Design a protein with these regions (language model features):
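RNA substrate-binding interface of SAM-dependent RNA methyltransferases
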Residues: 1-67
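A generic "binding-loop/recognition-motif" signal
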Residues: 9-10, 74, 98, 131
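Short, charged, surface-exposed secondary-structure boundary motifs
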Residues: 16, 77-79, 127-131
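Short, hinge-like loop/turn segments at secondary-structure boundaries
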Residues: 21-25, 85, 136-137
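A short acidic, often aromatic-flanked loop/helix-cap motif at beta-alpha or helix-coil junctions
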Residues: 52-57, 74-76, 125
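Active-site/ligand-binding-proximal alpha/beta "capping" segment
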Residues: 63-101, 105-106, 115-119
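Structured adenosyl-cofactor binding patch, chiefly the S-adenosyl-L-methionine
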Residues: 104-144
Length: 144
């Protein structure tokens, strides 16, 4: 993981406020640094300032593979997507929604920009759990 970005989506309950965002980002940076030390990683992921949904999708779709985690119709299982790759792409972006998930309009916008719609199984995962789940799947595929 190289970059962690928060963004505002339609169904997000928490609204980003400039006053508290700096403090939250500093906390996220400390967590990223401690996690990197614990895992003996030389690279500490960058924690960027919050961006709009549109900017987040623009950034995410610059990678070789953009996985848009969506619980709606028309998704492919994550395992199927990863098995279809001969080799794991050099750069992968993972877009995970807030506690309210994504609206259909957001999913359509991401798909139009080239994101691959993926599901994470039958259960709806919490945001924190979903990110760890997807990262673990990517690490498993890349290290086998």
């Amino acid at each position: 993981m190289e970059l962690f970005t928060t963004f505002q989506s339609d169904r997000c309950v928490v609204r980003i406020k400039d006053a508290s965002e700096d403090r939250k980002n500093e906390r996220r940076r400390r967590i990223a640094t401690e996690a990197a030390k614990q895992c003996r990683r030389s690279l500490v992921p960058e924690v960027s300032a919050a961006v709009s949904f549109e900017k987040a999708i623009d950034l995410a779709t610059e990678s070789d593979l953009c996985l848009f985690c969506y619980e709606g119709e028309g998704t492919l299982p994550l395992g199927e997507i990863l098995r279809s790759c001969d080799t794991l792409p050099r750069s992968v972006s993972i877009v995970i929604g807030s506690e309210g998930g994504f609206s259909e309009a957001e999913a359509e916008a991401a798909k139009a920009k080239g994101a691959v719609m993926t599901g994470l199984g039958k259960r709806i995962l919490r945001t924190e759990t979903a990110s760890g789940f997807v990262l673990a799947c990517l690490v498993m595929i890349s290290e086998l």
